[in-house]
Amino acid sequence: MINQPLLTDKVIALRRFHPRDVDALCAAARESLEDLIPWMSWAHPAYGRDEVAEFIRIVGETWEAGRYYALAVTDARDGTMLGAVSLSHIHLVYNFCNLGYWTRSSRRGNGLASRAARLAANFGFEQLGLL
């Protein structure tokens, strides 16, 4: 099991999701549905709190099992929920995975997704031993 990271570049911070994140993550996702629907299979017009709560529950379990690492993307200064980044489909033989991310629409154009991807990739390389 990997310990909970707090990864930051002083602009954003990545951390594990907690049950208390349900409302903030739901608000970020709902705000961004128009942008997310074409790209994220989970995004749909009725996406809401119950699905977010289930997501947070499941990613807690898959984190503990070492199968899927989802991280909250937050503002490093005030903790505002900005989106999510994940390492999935981890291949233990070849030491690689998929990296996915999204950031809330109201913060688009500030380089947050690139920052989140960079921090998550470093987590994969340094903590998970991926190539």
Where are these regions (language model features)?
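GNAT-family acyltransferases
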Residues: 1-106
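Generic helix-packing signal
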Residues: 33, 56, 120-128
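Conserved acetyl-CoA-binding loop-helix of GNAT-fold acetyltransferases
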Residues: 101-103, 109-126
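Short acidic/polar active-site loop segments enriched in Thr and Asp
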Residues: 131
